[in-house]
C-alpha cells in the first residue's frame, strides 16, 4: 500500500500547499529550514544567526531532493539565504522561494517570519455578503509598479493609500 508523501505529491503537481512544506519555520528553540534542490551537491543556510558564515549550517538531503535542517537560536526577524552547490560545483547564494518575508531592496535576503497574527474581524466576516459568482482579480508587482519622482521605490505603507478595493456590484 502506498503512503501519501506530500513532497512527492507536490513534485507530481497534486499538492497545492507547498508553503506548508518549504521555507523557514520558527520554533521555540530555533528555526527549521526546508528547500527543494534536487540537483544540488550540497545546501547550507546562512544568515544573521551565524554572522553570514558560509560553512555553519549544512542541510541534509532527503531522497526527493528536499534539503532540511534546524538552526538552534535562529529567530523571527533575522535574514537568511541558502548556499547551494550545483552538480557542476558552482556555488550560488539564493533567497528562499518560499520565504514569508524578504529584505527591502537593494538587499535580496529572505527574512524569517511568523504568521501569528490575531485576527479580530469575526463580526465583519459574519456579516459580509457572500460572493456568488466569478470575480476579476488584478495583480501588480508593488515593487515595480510605481516610483517616486527621484526614482526611489514606494514603501508598503506609502502604497496603501493608493490601493482601492471595491465591493462587487450586483
Residue ranges of predicted features:
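Short proline/glycine-enriched turn/loop motifs at strand-loop junctions of beta-rich domains
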Residues: 36-43
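Residue-level detector of conserved catalytic or cofactor/ligand-binding positions
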Residues: 161-169
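Beta-strand-rich interaction surfaces with strong enrichment in secreted/lumenal proteins
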Residues: 56-59
Amino acid at each position: 500500500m502506498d503512503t501519501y508523501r506530500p513532497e512527492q505529491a507536490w513534485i507530481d503537481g497534486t499538492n497545492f500547499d507547498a508553503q506548508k512544506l518549504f521555507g523557514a519555520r520558527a520554533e521555540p528553540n530555533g528555526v527549521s529550514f526546508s528547500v527543494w534542490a534536487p540537483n544540488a551537491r550540497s545546501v547550507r543556510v546562512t544568515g544573521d544567526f551565524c554572522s553570514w558564515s558560509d560553512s555553519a549550517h549544512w542541510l541534509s538531503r532527503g531522497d526527493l531532493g528536499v534539503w532540511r535542517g534546524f538552526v538552534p537560536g535562529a529567530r523571527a526577524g533575522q535574514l537568511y539565504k541558502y548556499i547551494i552547490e550545483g552538480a557542476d560545483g558552482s556555488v550560488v547564494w539564493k533567497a528562499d522561494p518560499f520565504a514569508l518575508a524578504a529584505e527591502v531592496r537593494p538587499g535580496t535576503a529572505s527574512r524569517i517570519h511568523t504568521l501569528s497574527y490575531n485576527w479580530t474581524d469575526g463580526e465583519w466576516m459574519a456579516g459580509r455578503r457572500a460572493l456568488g459568482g466569478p470575480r476579476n482579480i488584478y495583480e501588480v508587482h508593488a515593487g515595480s509598479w510605481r516610483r517616486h519622482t527621484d526614482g526611489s521605490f514606494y514603501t508598503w505603507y506609502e502604497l496603501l493609500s493608493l490601493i482601492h478595493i471595491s465591493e462587487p456590484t450586483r
